[in-house]
């Protein structure tokens, strides 16, 4: 009798995977999130395990395993043994190239499938001094557990300030225009609106029409890309079967202070600056690749043709949640958090075109990036792509949703 009651209670706690979570379990699309964090001091695995037991393990997604019942994937609560999830390899501190070793370790980690008999997450602790940290922690989390916004908020909710062990960390709010400028602009706008309400009405109608037009164009381009519209063949475009080959994580550190300096001077966002830097790097690299065998006299012509012939785009995931910021750990643990805050995978897709061209003024890369991002902000592409993907998965299944 007791076993039946326990089984009934467990069934009530089970939760069917959402369409977005199912997509990340589709064949050829088994996605994981790899997060690397550096520490200024060596990591004590005992303290880490103790902290996980009081924080991360309490979240339903990190204490549930994936089971298939009646041909449906479900999250089923289970007893978590932290020892099975925290991996501490024995390392030789005399490794000649620690940075290279860490890159190889992470790359190898992406080739190992996760054990579905336990919750789909792991934490690897590497007490190995590198050029950027005394020790490294590597999270490997299946994407069906949650997206980046969910996981970052949960991670921050599990931490506390060093100055106040009981307080959550604070995140600087986005800077707006100064109070005086805002007041002046507001007063000017109010005067203009009161003196010419018809002009304001026409402006609102124009912005709505622009939103509809941008959304329609973006959706047509999105569908066209799925069907026939491909990027130009460049060194960045992978060949068929590239998704099955081992991956390597290569990165470079940049100064956030430098990015903030450009951002503040040009009155832009960090995303604008980063996209501009990316466009500059891609343009210069492609020009070097395509023009490396040309003579100096012909190189200028090659640069001009580069500006007009390259189609290069990136798929960017966009957080669709209306609420932003750090949620308390208690809120993230509650059942109502799923509906109120949207734990899981609430992300849409947008296609961002790169402007591949050589600019005489380096700041032009950032100006063009801002124009691209501002154009994308005035579009509902992310919301529509999310809903379309959800509809396809619910109608035809997650395997069809992953058709390439």
Q: Each predicted region: which residue ranges?
A:
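Soluble acyl-CoA-dependent acyltransferase catalytic core bearing the H(X)4D motif
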Residues: 2-14, 25, 34-404
């Amino acid at each position: 009798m007791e076993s039946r009651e326990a089984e009934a209670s467990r069934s009530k706690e089970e939760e069917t995977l959402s369409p977005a979570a199912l997509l990340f379990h589709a064949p050829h699309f088994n996605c994981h999130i790899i997060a690397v964090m550096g520490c200024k001091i060596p990591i004590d695995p005992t303290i880490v395990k103790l902290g996980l037991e009081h924080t991360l393990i309490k979240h339903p997604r990190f204490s549930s395993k994936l089971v298939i019942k009646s041909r449906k994937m479900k999250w089923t609560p289970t007893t978590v043994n932290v020892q099975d999830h925290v991996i501490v390899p024995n390392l030789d501190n005399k490794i000649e190239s620690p940075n290279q070793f860490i890159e190889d370790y992470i790359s190898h980690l992406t080739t190992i499938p996760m054990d579905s008999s336990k919750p789909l997450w792991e934490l690897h602790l590497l007490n190995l001094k590198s050029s950027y940290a005394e020790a490294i922690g590597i999270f490997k989390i299946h994407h069906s557990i949650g997206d980046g916004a969910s996981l970052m908020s949960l991670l921050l909710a599990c931490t506390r300030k060093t100055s106040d062990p009981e307080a959550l960390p604070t995140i600087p709010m986005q800077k707006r225009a100064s109070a005086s400028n805002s007041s002046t602009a507001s007063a000017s706008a109010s005067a203009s609106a009161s003196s010419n309400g018809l002009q304001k009405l026409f402006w609102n109608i124009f912005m709505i029409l622009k939103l509809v037009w941008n959304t329609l164009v973006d959706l047509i381009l999105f569908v066209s890309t799925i069907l026939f519209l491909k990027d130009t063949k460049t060194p960045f475009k992978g060949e068929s079967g590239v998704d099955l080959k081992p991956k390597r994580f290569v990165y470079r550190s940049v100064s956030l202070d430098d990015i903030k300096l450009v951002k503040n001077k040009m009155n832009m966002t960090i995303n604008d600056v980063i996209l501009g830097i990316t466009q500059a790097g891609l343009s210069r690299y492609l020009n070097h690749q395509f023009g490396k065998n040309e003579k100096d006299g012909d190189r200028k012509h090659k640069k001009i043709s580069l500006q007009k012939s390259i189609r290069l785009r990136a798929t960017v995931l966009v957080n669709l949640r209306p609420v932003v910021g750090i949620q308390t750990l208690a809120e993230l643990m509650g059942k109502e958090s799923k509906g109120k805050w949207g734990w899981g995978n609430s992300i849409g897709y947008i296609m961002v075109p790169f402007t591949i061209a050589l600019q005489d003024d380096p700041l032009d890369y950032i100006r063009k990036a801002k124009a691209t991002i501002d154009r994308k902000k005035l579009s509902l592409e992310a919301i529509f792509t999310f809903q379309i993907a959800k509809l396809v998965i619910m109608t035809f299944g997650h395997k069809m949703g992953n058709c390439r």
